[in-house]
């Protein structure tokens, strides 16, 4: 599989930098790479173009890409920003794209897995969440969520919120300990993630065959 992972949040200069999410993202990537000893997959890592050193992530089966003009995104019209990032992702020809920080580029036609570290509890929080964390998209939170084939959350409470408040299908939600990820048990998480990636990529291939 060609698995893309959004890693731009690890840059401290990023305007939405969160040390907790950055640490989770970095650990996610390093553990996925370490587990893939047979190099069965190609890992496409997307960094902020201001990220100077990516040596710790470099492997024979890793492709390093940098989002263009990411620091100027705030000056771009919202739709153009989405188009730019979505076309950049599409050019990578991924089987699945995982955003560990909850970003969903709503113009991207590929298969998306995303991790929500927070689930809005109501409409006002949903609007703020979309504007702040999801590229400033002016679309309903529930509609944006449907672009993701799987959403990873840290608790059953978050899953219930996604289902009851936002109408996201329960069968597409994966409950996985995010907050305690730093304490270990990454082998179990990596195994679960690879299963999710295969399910999403597999469904994509089946849909292409039907067409």
Residue ranges, per PLM feature:
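Carbohydrate transferase catalytic cores enriched for Leloir-type hexosyltransferases
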Residues: 1-211
């Amino acid at each position: 599989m060609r698995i893309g992972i959004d890693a731009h949040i690890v840059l401290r200069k990023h305007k939405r930098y969160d040390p907790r999410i950055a640490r989770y993202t970095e650990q996610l990537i390093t553990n996925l790479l370490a587990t893939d000893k047979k190099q069965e997959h190609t890992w496409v890592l997307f960094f902020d173009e201001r990220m100077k050193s990516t040596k710790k992530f470099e492997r024979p089966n890793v492709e390093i890409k940098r989002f263009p003009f990411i620091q100027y995104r705030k000056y771009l019209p919202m739709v153009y920003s989405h188009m730019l990032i979505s076309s950049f992702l599409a050019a990578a020809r991924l089987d699945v794209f995982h955003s560990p920080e909850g970003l969903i580029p709503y113009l991207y036609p590929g298969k998306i897995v995303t991790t929500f570290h927070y689930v809005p509890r109501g409409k006002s929080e949903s609007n703020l969440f979309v504007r702040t964390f999801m590229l400033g998209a002016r679309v309903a939170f529930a509609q944006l969520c449907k672009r993701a084939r799987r959403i990873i959350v840290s608790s059953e409470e978050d899953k219930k919120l996604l289902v009851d408040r936002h109408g996201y299908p329960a069968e597409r939600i994966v409950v996985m300990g995010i907050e305690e990820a730093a304490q270990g048990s990454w082998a179990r998480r990596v195994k679960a993630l690879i299963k999710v990636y295969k399910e999403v990529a597999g469904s994509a291939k089946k849909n292409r065959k039907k067409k």
